[in-house]
Curated annotation (Swiss-Prot):
Record-annotated disulphide pairs: none
Keyword Plastid set for record: no
HAMAP family in UniProt: SecB
Phylogenetic lineage: Bacteria, Pseudomonadati, Pseudomonadota, Alphaproteobacteria, Rhodospirillales
Name this polypeptide is given: Protein-export protein SecB
Record localization: Cytoplasm
Length: 160
């Protein structure tokens, strides 16, 4: 006989991606058709990305990878692409590891699919496919944690 105590969730995978889906998708070419006459290459495309995680159930979360991209040619808006790409994930890890896994690892797994959707979307919209370089979700997470800590410190200083 063994005296070993089973760890809860030890027989389960630490991370399960239950599904991925497009929650919201929008593409606009507000200056069409004139903008295509000015098209002589890839537009300037600043990319805004946000990652959020929302609990759905116990150890069950929706992770959202949101992109907002506004392509410009000679200062004019060529296109606006918005994508809210989500995954439903089950996380079987100790509580202190859940937040980083949801905001670093899950988006890292989702990113290639979202990038492909955006490349197809811009191509089908009449532009060159937008090839987004891999994102550093760990750096994004660190920046978010530092910003939250700075805000908390500022609030504490103001309260005293």
């Amino acid at each position: 006989m063994s005296d070993e105590t089973a760890t809860p969730g030890a027989d389960q995978a630490p991370l399960i991606i239950n599904g991925q889906y497009i929650k919201d998708l929008s593409f606009e070419v507000p200056n069409a058709p004139r903008i295509f006459a000015e098209l002589d290459g890839q537009p300037e495309v600043p990319i805004n990305v946000d990652v959020t995680a929302t609990p759905v159930g116990e150890r069950f979360f929706e992770v959202s990878l949101k992109f907002r991209i506004e392509g410009r040619i000679k200062g004019k808006v060529a296109f606006i692409a918005e994508l809210d790409y989500c995954a439903v994930a089950t996380v079987n890890l100790p509580d202190e590891h859940i937040h980083p896994v949801l905001l670093i690892e899950v988006p890292r797994l989702m990113f290639p699919f979202a990038r492909n959707i955006l490349a197809d979307l811009t191509r089908d919209g009449g532009f060159l496919p937008l090839m987004i370089q891999p994102l550093d979700f760990a750096a994004m997470y660190r920046n978010r944690v530092q910003a939250a800590q700075s805000q908390a410190a500022a609030e504490n200083a103001a309260a005293n």
